[in-house]
Amino acid sequence: MVAKIRSLGLQGIGGYEVSAEIFLSGGLPQFDLVGLPDAAVKEARERVRASVKNCGLDFPVSRVTVNLAPADRKKAGTVYDLPILLGILIASGQARPLPPDAAVIGELSLSGEVRPVRGALPMALAAEKAGIRELYVPAGNAREAAYADHLTVYPVHTVPELLVHLAGEKKITPAEPPMPSEEELLFPDYAEVKGQENVKRALEVAAAGGHNVLMVGPPGSGKSMLAKRLPGILPDMSREETMESTGIWSVCGLTDEKRPILRQRPFRAPHHTLSAAAMAGGAQLQPGEVSLAHNGVLFLDELPEYHRDVLEVMRQPLEDGVVTVSRAAGTAVYPSRFMLVCAMNPCKCGWYGQPGGRCRCSEKSVRAYHAKLSGPLMDRIDIIVEVPALAYDELRRRPDGESSETIRQRVNRAREVQRKRFSSGTVSNANMSPRDMERYCSLTPEGDALMKDAFHALGLTARSYVRILRVARTIADLAGAKDIAPEHIAEAVQYRTYDFLISSSPEVTP
């Protein structure tokens, strides 16, 4: 007899339907798995055999052949344990068949418990597309999978529980989609940050237009503190963004029963010792940091300390919003549209340009330190802002700045203007094409005159001109202005005149 169980698999961060076909035949007892299984799938034979026996059931004394179709796609992970076991029990007459529009996923323990798997939400979305209406998943994945529409998700704790449900004796209660809690949406507040009003304003502009930022300042000036509060002023994620980000985190095993859905915008701050593979994506086609930060913020502290090859792999995601990972296991394309926020000291010791003569670096040493900055990466940074050390009086003063919520309301209004402006493709001012800029970056006569003066006086390049115009458009959006006025140009130019950086590299000078 042949039993067919509908299941699901993962490739990259996308799911696809898999059919587990189980055939019991005569001959010497043997358990064969075919269909390009990896080592984890092959080990399912021992987990399934032990689970059947420890649940008080009989493992067939016959030849068991399991085919995971389509047979030309590699199968990985432990997600097929439960469908294989259920197919064997159905084929041997020890379990009732599943409905034709039902699918099963889950890892087994040796005692018959059903353990969580990675990628529950992407597989649930794939189940929807495949016309599946009932999905049996590990209880630890149920709330995550239930976020998919038009799908009844049954949380399964143990094999006997599933068998009793299929027999109609005691039904499993379907899982409910997770509701957001206040704790999930809490962020550190900018009201807690003393001083640095100019930097807060620069980060507000960056958040409103999706611009990449570089903060330069001495140790202890608050660069990391300011960066960590940036997600709190970004707009809430849409349902589509939530599904994308949750899917990526789920494939990496970063979701759990307590936090099944990612509702906060991601904030990733990888250490400067990470490898290029960890940044872009690993050997097993796992998403890297640029994808884990999708729809959120990627914070690189001590930017010059990162290996150059690590910084270079960010060029494609910053340009295209996706990253292509090619490894021996195959090729995968992951979404990776994020805000890049970088921080660095002005020199190796950190005290260049500070009063008191604390810096011991030579000018040659400072230039060499700045030359570590990747030219193509700096090309994609719109806002560069100095973060000065706080004076004693500022440290003693009680924080009296605006709250993140107040700033966020202005950011939301500016983002809504951009959403209405760009019908498709472009999602923020930072991603404007030359055609978009021609259409939407109109300057007042006074604004045009100031832009011309700044261009000649500062020796700006064409690239700097484009960056200034994009940032000025965002500043105008925050002000509710249709055209770009002189005050918008003046503020945008301020974010490009960074005399506190010295470098022999032409890419990091205006």
Segments predicted by a language model, with ranges:
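Basic, amphipathic alpha-helical bundle interface domains used for macromolecular binding and assembly
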Residues: 34-45, 58-60, 67-77, 284-285, ...
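Peripheral, non-AAA+ core regions of ATP-driven protein-machinery
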Residues: 1-214, 218-224, 464-465, 482-510
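Short secondary-structure boundary/capping segments
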Residues: 10, 94-96, 145, 182, ...
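Positions in alpha-helical segments
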Residues: 185-188, 228, 364, 453
